[in-house]
Amino acid sequence: MTEHRLEPTPETTVDVFSRDTAPVLAVEPGDTVVVRSLDAIGHLERQQKPGEVQPLMFEPRRGHCLTGPIEVHGAEPGTVLAVRLLSMRPGDWGWTAAATKDNWLTRRLGLADGPPSRLLWELDAERGVGINDRGHSVALAPFLGVIGLPPAAGGEHSTNPPRAEGGGNIDCRELVAGSTLYLPVTVPGALLHLGDGHAAQGDGEVGGTAIECPMTTEVVLDVITEPAAPGIHAVTPAGRITFGFHPDLNEAMAEALDAMLVWMQALLALDGDDAKATALAVASAAGDLRITQVANDTWGVHAVLPHGAIG
């Protein structure tokens, strides 16, 4: 198998999804790709102080600065792209901003009329620690916020909302190194985009941003025809994961749970009229529901079945 490397340049980055964008790299199933991505908004130079304006890859900017698209030979609608995340190494700096928008949440929290907070982080990937300009330190757990394919429909599509069709801005903190994300293929060649590095993030991404940072990611890309679960799903060091995306958090929860119940019926070899109800009963004892993010208008919930939770 071949190893490829992809750097972020004006020719290899985009800020919208489109099936019409020509691939910047074509690979075979099983190939390894080392992808370097800028931070979410595409800073070309690091900030020296919180909130400092620096040149961006795209001005004006329409969405996340993503590296790609990557064509995978043999990936066609009806197949699934397996993205195996071998390693993720954040850059040496990152930023976080909160209460920057006047929306229902900032109004509910009494923050809409006050000043926002902007933090600048020094990131030590070797030690796995980030320290911000206020002196707070957090453990790093790097992952990519955006791993996605363009929608099947033509035209340009925002990178902001995660989609059941193609994934994208999933923002799931579970997708660390050692995980495999399974994306049903939406367009010929898959046209994978990667970016939006997060050095650390809590469930919910409650402030609207994580520790946003450049990232170097090593992936192995493969094409499978018989996925273990419906829709977008993952196997991570923590367990099996299914996702739901919807502006209504209740609907997002139901989507994630429904996909997990289908997966559990197969895992537990359940059959009969009560198979799904039995899966729900077992999930109630051994599974988890977590709010992925409330930052992207289309909210996310993921269901988690931890490894070894069921004997």
Which positions does each model-derived feature cover?
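Short, Lys/Arg- and Gly-enriched loop/turn segments at beta-strand edges
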Residues: 40-51, 88-98, 189-199, 292-295
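N-terminal, Lys/Arg-enriched amphipathic/low-complexity engagement segments
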Residues: 1-58
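A hydrophobic, small-residue-rich beta->alpha segment in the mid-to-C-terminal subdomain
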Residues: 227-282
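Intrinsically disordered, low-complexity linker/loop segments enriched in Gly/Pro
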Residues: 87-177
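Short, structured beta-strand/loop micro-motifs enriched in basic residues and often containing a Trp
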Residues: 8-18, 59-67, 158-166
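A generic structural signal for residues embedded in beta-strands
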Residues: 35, 80-83, 183
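Conserved mixed alpha/beta catalytic, RNA-binding, or beta-rich assembly cores of soluble enzyme
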Residues: 140-169, 173-250
